[in-house]
Amino acid sequence: MSSTYKATGINLKAMPLGESDRLLTILTREYGLIRVVAPGARKPRSSLGGRSGLFVVNELLIAPGRSLHKLSQAETLTSYARLSKHLSTLTASQYLAELVIYQALSEQPQVELFDLLCYYLSWLEQSPEQEVLAVLSRAVFHLLEWAGIAPQVQQCCLTRRPITPDYTDPDWRIGFSCRAGGTVTSLAEALSLPASELQSTPAVPSRSAPALEHPHVYLTAIELEVLQHLSTSLPSSPTVSWSDLPPPSHYPTWVWLAIERTLRQYIQSYLDRPIRSAVLMDACFSPLSPAFS
């Protein structure tokens, strides 16, 4: 690009640069993920100050540079200011932004991903705090499905046999293997590890645990039910409601917490990198306070 160009983008990340500039990571509909400098954005009276905030959607005029592009003008189309009303809502939004940054391509249109992110940010903005985990879990699964990397939860990844939750046995569990790519009826066989070693591995890895450990969990019947609903009820587009899926409040928050952690482990294992925003998610929801029970 030899001259200025226009794009519609949402700010996903902002970092201080120099004395008064701001370095922005933006997802645009037309050009995918870009990094631009917002000159003087940190000055008190800068016209780019508010427009360079997180989750602000702008019509952008950008001047290409040798290493970094420069933001010349920005006209705000919409913003998701209410995401900051609760720490849990803001953290969930940052979680999604982090995942989108990992998924988005550069120098290619990303219209569907852009619309998908905005759809879930709008949903989060309107959700009561008790439903944040449910909306986040739906959004994460939808983003994984969009990228073609959603976990298999309808059948065993090893035997390809269908799996049905068993509610008659209160101790019934099904394995979920990040390495195998989803549910497995024989966790030891799927991971080629002895059962004693599997049982000694923590279900939720510590912050210091590397993603290469390929963590696993055991799902209860209700947790598998939710994951199977998520995989079969995805809307055909961001503007279409979820079909055949109970409202977020239908399941208790602890179930959604288990779903989020399972999907988080899967993502971190697949991408071989941590979801840094997840640390705050743990602070918000674990252990669950009475408000979230």
Curated annotation (Swiss-Prot):
Q: Name one GO cellular component term.
A: bacterial nucleoid
Q: Give me any GO biological process, just one.
A: double-strand break repair
Q: Which InterPro entries match?
A: ARFGAP/RecO, DNA_rep/recomb_RecO_N, NA-bd_OB-fold, RecO, RecO_C
Q: Identify the keywords attached in UniProt to this record, alphabetized.
A: DNA damage, DNA recombination, DNA repair
Which Pfam families does the annotation name? Answer: RecO_C, RecO_N
- Identify the domain of life: Bacteria
Q: Which HAMAP family does the record match to this protein? A: RecO
Main function: Involved in DNA repair and RecF pathway recombination.
Q: Which family does it belong to?
A: Belongs to the RecO family.
Q: What is this protein called?
A: DNA repair protein RecO
Q: What is the lineage of its organism?
A: Bacteria, Bacillati, Cyanobacteriota, Cyanophyceae, Gomontiellales
The gene it comes from is recO
